[in-house]
UniProtKB/Swiss-Prot annotation:
Required for maturation of urease via the functional incorporation of the urease nickel metallocenter. Disulfide bonds: none annotated. It is found in: Cytoplasm. InterPro entries: UreF, UreF_sf. This is Urease accessory protein UreF. The lineage of its organism: Bacteria, Pseudomonadati, Pseudomonadota, Gammaproteobacteria, Oceanospirillales.
């Protein structure tokens, strides 16, 4: 009976850690970036709930599934093996996959914020304060530190990203709160498919190209007025 109770408590603690790490309340600033969506909406490329779903769903399948989630898995493996050199290599890889300065800033700004938080929570990392750190890499280190399974860490990462994107769309299109919840429900299937795809992608196959999103992100810098950071 004691063993069963211990297992339940351990599982509950890990679930709570997953919720903590993937919460939109995590102070890393994910809400500050639209990842090109603001420009796309301003130009009329994305005008309604259906087009928001297409825009976000494409990124889940072609970007997160082929870059962020595979690197997250590989970083968790490296962290588990305490392979610092490998972590730095993977960190460089994911940053090299960012197609614009804005997308790279999105990743490193969130990475720097998570680094500060992890330091406060006494989670060790091999990085130093002035290093250029990917949010993906640090998320993986934190997930490994808390004993999360790879598939659950990927789920939490993707869910957090999805919530931030839909929150941005809710402000920009704009969408109603009910429509936002409908989108969260619709795109859960895309998350599941993205994770399944990512588990089969090794380092040499990491990479994706989404020209429209890269263009939107690059041109967002000179957009006349912006709600989101560039």
């Amino acid at each position: 009976m004691d063993t069963v109770t211990t297992n339940i408590v351990t599982t509950d603690i890990r679930l709570l850690r997953l919720l903590q790490l993937s919460s939109v309340g995590l102070p890393v600033g994910g809400f500050a970036f639209s990842q090109g969506m603001e420009y796309a909406i301003d130009q009329g490329w994305v005008k309604n709930k259906t087009e928001v779903s297409d825009w976000i769903g494409l990124q889940l399948q072609q970007s997160l599934a082929r870059v962020d989630l595979p690197v997250l898995r590989l970083c968790m493996d490296a962290a588990k093996q305490q392979n610092t050199e490998r972590l730095f290599e993977l960190n460089d890889l994911v940053l090299a996959c960012r197609e614009t300065k804005e997308l790279r800033l999105n990743d490193t700004a969130m990475g720097e914020a998570l680094f500060r938080l992890m330091s406060s929570l006494q989670i060790d990392t091999p990085f130093k304060r002035l290093d250029e750190m990917s949010f993906v890499t640090l998320f993986a280190i934190a997930a490994n530190h808390w004993g999360l399974q790879v598939d659950l860490a990927c789920l939490g990462f993707a869910w957090s990203w999805l919530e931030n994107q839909i929150a941005a769309a809710t402000k920009l299109v704009p969408l109603g709160q009910t429509q936002a919840q409908e989108l969260l429900g619709e795109l859960q299937t895309d998350i599941r498919h993205a994770i399944a795809m990512s588990l089969n992608i090794e380092e040499e196959r990491v990479g994706a190209g989404l020209p429209a999103i890269a263009i939107a992100s690059a041109l967002h810098e000179t957009q006349y007025s912006r709600l989101f950071r560039s």
